[in-house]
């Protein structure tokens, strides 16, 4: 309104000046009149430009990067991408799809990338505190034959997750994930707190950070595009209440390292206090432009018996351990677009006591290996991938794992923020040579399945937000 009044006033001034000039000085030249008109018209144009900028500022809730790669939004509450990028069609930019191992470091790294984007835009950082929500819904159906030879079909709402990321200030942030799992019952409910932790760190200013809470400790990597859990994850992934001290470089080629201590889940006969477990992880991520990238690394954990796979099988009814068994993990991935290769190896460093986990009349020393190759392409215009996987275990009968696992799988993003996956899996069980007959004998129901194989076809649909 003010700008309109000013423009109107200037218009009146122009009219008044012209009439006065023409009336009082008939001898004034046309050139002088033209100069005055041009000067006043320039003032009017400048005011109109300012008025237009003010209107645009009020209408635009965000600004776009010059490279059209991200959006800046100052809202304190949002749903969707952690970085305000132009959303990825497959939902890979959503918090729900941040890998759960080393989750604290990855979230801090994303926060650093957001700050870099803001600096490139020349805009201030988002206001704090800020909250970002994300999650997924998952349905699954399968048909196959079991080790026993029976055939069955299954339809299941196989999972749901609701994640919340909170950034209190540039140095302190937190994360929690509520899960629904039809196969896990916690305190009478299938909804439970899967992960929850607080992070202290700012990778833009300092490469070290710390976190405390319930996490998947940084042992192993378990990368896969299969529906079925890799045998390495089934053997080694460990969820615990831990405190972590980490080091994380930024950039395309970055070193990372973590040292953590956690509250153990098994009681050790030789120790009165079992809250003294620990582990470490060191890795290196590299990238050579958009075509080649990958990661290599190694992990150590002081007690493999605390893994989810061991807790759900060998130590389901008995948390007493004669002696703890440490484990080592080695992992690597290499992407040479459009092909991605993944490999990982998990191994106990010594045998369990025969009374805890046995194999062929002796203490078991379980190991697991997983490898897969994926090829990305488009089905019509939809991002897709096809892959093959192979898993092998040794002395892992007591953990309920097959000796060999073969998989073929296909993924396609039919709609934005969705994924449809189809998988065929063939498992080959251990032979009867794995039986223990003396101390801690192999259960009869396990013996009945030895030397057999199964086949399962699974379809799964995920919706991310």
Swiss-Prot record:
Residues 28-60 form a coiled coil. Residues 1-23 form the signal peptide. Keywords: Coiled coil, Signal. Belongs to the UPF0422 family. This is UPF0422 protein CBU_0937. It comes from Coxiella burnetii (strain RSA 493 / Nine Mile phase I). The lineage of its organism: Bacteria, Pseudomonadati, Pseudomonadota, Gammaproteobacteria, Legionellales.
């Amino acid at each position: 309104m003010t700008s309109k009044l000013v423009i109107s006033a200037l218009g009146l001034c122009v009219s008044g000046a012209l009439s006065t000039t023409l009336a009082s000085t008939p001898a004034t030249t046309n050139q002088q009149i033209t100069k005055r008109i041009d000067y006043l018209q320039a003032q009017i144009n400048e005011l109109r430009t300012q008025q237009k900028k003010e209107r645009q500022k009020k209408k635009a809730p965000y600004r776009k990067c010059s490279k059209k790669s991200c959006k800046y939004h100052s809202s304190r509450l949002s749903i969707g991408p952690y970085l305000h990028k132009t959303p990825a069609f497959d939902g890979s930019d959503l918090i729900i799809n941040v890998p759960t191992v080393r989750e604290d470091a990855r979230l801090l790294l994303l926060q650093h990338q957001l700050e870099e984007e803001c600096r490139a835009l020349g805009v201030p950082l988002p206001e704090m505190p800020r909250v970002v929500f994300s999650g997924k819904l998952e349905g699954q159906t399968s048909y196959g034959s079991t080790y026993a030879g029976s055939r069955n079909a299954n339809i299941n709402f196989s999972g749901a997750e609701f994640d919340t990321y909170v950034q209190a200030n540039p140095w302190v942030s937190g994360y929690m994930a509520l899960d629904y799992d039809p196969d896990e019952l916690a305190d009478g409910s299938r909804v439970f707190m899967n992960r929850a932790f607080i992070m202290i760190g700012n990778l833009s200013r300092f490469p070290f950070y710390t976190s405390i809470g319930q996490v998947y400790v940084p042992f192993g990597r378990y990368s896969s595009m299969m529906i079925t859990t890799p045998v390495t994850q089934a053997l080694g992934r460990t969820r615990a209440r831990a405190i972590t001290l980490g080091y994380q470089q930024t950039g395309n080629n970055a070193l990372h390292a973590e040292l953590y201590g956690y509250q153990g889940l098994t009681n050790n006969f030789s120790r009165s206090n079992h809250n003294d477990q620990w582990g470490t992880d060191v890795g290196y991520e590299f990238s050579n432009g958009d075509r080649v990238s990958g990661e290599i690394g190694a992990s150590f954990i002081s007690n493999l018996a605390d893994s989810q796979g061991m807790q759900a099988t060998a130590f389901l009814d008995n948390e007493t351990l004669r002696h703890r068994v440490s484990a080592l993990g080695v992992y690597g991935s290499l992407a040479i677009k459009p092909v991605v290769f993944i490999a990982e190896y998990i191994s106990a460093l010594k045998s369990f006591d025969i009374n805890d986990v046995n194999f062929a009349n002796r203490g078991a020393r379980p190991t697991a290996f997983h490898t897969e190759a994926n090829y990305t392409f488009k089905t019509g215009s939809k991002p897709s991938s096809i892959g093959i996987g192979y898993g092998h275990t040794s002395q892992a009968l007591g953990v309920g794992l097959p000796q060999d696992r073969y998989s073929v799988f296909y993924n396609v993003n039919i709609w934005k923020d969705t994924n449809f996956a189809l998988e065929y899996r063939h498992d080959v069980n251990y032979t009867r040579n794995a039986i223990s007959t003396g101390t801690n004998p192999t259960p009869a129901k396990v013996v009945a399945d030895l030397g057999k194989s199964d086949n399962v076809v699974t379809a799964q649909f995920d919706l991310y937000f």
